[in-house]
Amino acid sequence: MSLMRISTGKRGEELAAAYLAEAGYRIVERNYRCIFGEIDIVAEEGETLVFVEVKSRRSEAYGDPQLAVGYEKQKKISRIAMHYLEEKRLRRRPARFDVVAVKLLPAGHRVELIRNAFELTCG
């Protein structure tokens, strides 16, 4: 992975976490890792546990960042979320999946929150 891609991802995650905190979310964990992969942000909004995937782009050439969260990515995030809920003994806790799309453009950055971006995908 190139340094530019890593810095784009890190910058996007920083902006996303700040945006979520300002929107009333409480950040519980960042970059939660398990054997199935990583979730960018785990947060709480009220009683709901929110698993957040952050997608960042430095250009609009490849389309909107949130379009990168396709079915296979949703399955992977779902598997990681299930592992998290089991590990933390939170299986009965209401949970959902949000996506934060961050555009890091020369004219400035834009952050878009998509609540309930997808359902639990186990296929």
Task: Tell where the protein language model's regions lie, with residue ranges.
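Short acidic/glycine-enriched loop/turn segments that link adjacent beta-strands
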Residues: 35-37, 107
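Acidic-basic catalytic patches of nuclease active cores, encompassing PD-(D/E)XK
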Residues: 1-30
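Hydrophobic "anchor" residues on beta-strands that sit immediately upstream
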Residues: 26, 49, 94
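Conserved catalytic cores of phosphodiester-cleaving nucleases, focusing on short active-site segments
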Residues: 20, 39-65, 69, 77
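Domain-level recognition of nuclease-like catalytic cores that cleave nucleotide substrates
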Residues: 87-123
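Acidic active-site catalytic centers that drive phospho-/nucleotidyl reactions
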Residues: 13, 38-40, 53, 73, ...
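Mid-chain, well-packed structural core segment of small domains
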Residues: 62-95
